[in-house]
Amino acid sequence: MKRLLLIDGNSLFHRAYHALPPLTDRSGEMANAVFGFSNMLIKAIGEIKPTYIVCAFDTRAPTFRHIEFEKYKATRVTPPPDLYPQLPKVKKVLDAFGIVYFEKEGYEADDILATLAKKFQISNFKFQIVILSGDRDVLQLVDGDVKVQMPGWNLKETTLYGAKEVKEKYGLEPHQMVDYKSLTGDPSDNVPGITGIGPKTASQLLQQFHTLENLFDHVKETPLKVREKLEVGKDIALAAKRLMELDRSVDLKFEIGNLKFSPDWEKVRREYEGLGFKSIVAKLPQSVHSSQLTACLPARQVHRKKKTVNREPKTNNSDQLKLV
């Protein structure tokens, strides 16, 4: 079966920056986000062995969610000045791998991933789809053909979410995650939920009533204290759902055949040699005829005051991705 890897570029970019200490490339510019992003990308390629890869990024332009709710993501702090100057280098790495990436004003990377997953699911081919993201919003996309691989904050470990894993953690089916977050809110995006309705209560309500709309249709069947909270917060929750639900109909122009993953490893090697990431170069296939990547996390290279410190983490083989 063909395997598609969908990458949440912004999520991985931010996670890499905050997970790793300061690191400069050969030119002396900050590159810890580039290094960490590359770690996660190479690890995923080695484990999943995708037939196709696509990456998606946010743009700096407002989205339809900002228009709907002016305070959307308003509480997020100003990004560090050395973060976004690294983004062009991440995209250059993707270019070296031959990986296509999409970005579209008015939409977030998650919307693009949702659209791509849908388009591949309804194509003439059968795909196993893995979404690589640290954003739990994409859990709503999980179904029989779609799984989410979520890297840990240390970048070493990953958690694979299928429908079973989502239910074990939240007590809900993946498609209920939108309604769940509509009830609880999402502080990271500054989206309010219903005051007094926490994760446990939200999960219990959706286990009983299945959808947000059905819950409000049968609100009189809930305990009095819960009912009062639901009645007061109904409009808030319904508005939150419009923000939480990913758009699966973004207008994207592409041909599936152009997204096939077939890298020129010599080009990839030259890109990382140019950056001075020696430990990553060591993980690449040794010849253009080999496709074997070392899936473990490469060594950290931290350049401070012209000194290089290499710390090789212990290899953990227990988190190898299993696709069934």
Label each region the model flagged.
Residues 269-287, 305-307, 317-324:
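Long, highly charged low-complexity segments
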Residues 120-127, 252-254, 259, 291-293:
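Intrinsic disorder
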Residues 23-24, 74-249:
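Extended two-metal-dependent nuclease catalytic cores across DNA- and RNA-processing enzymes
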Residues 1-54, 58, 65:
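Non-catalytic, usually N-terminal nucleic-acid engagement modules in DNA/RNA processing proteins
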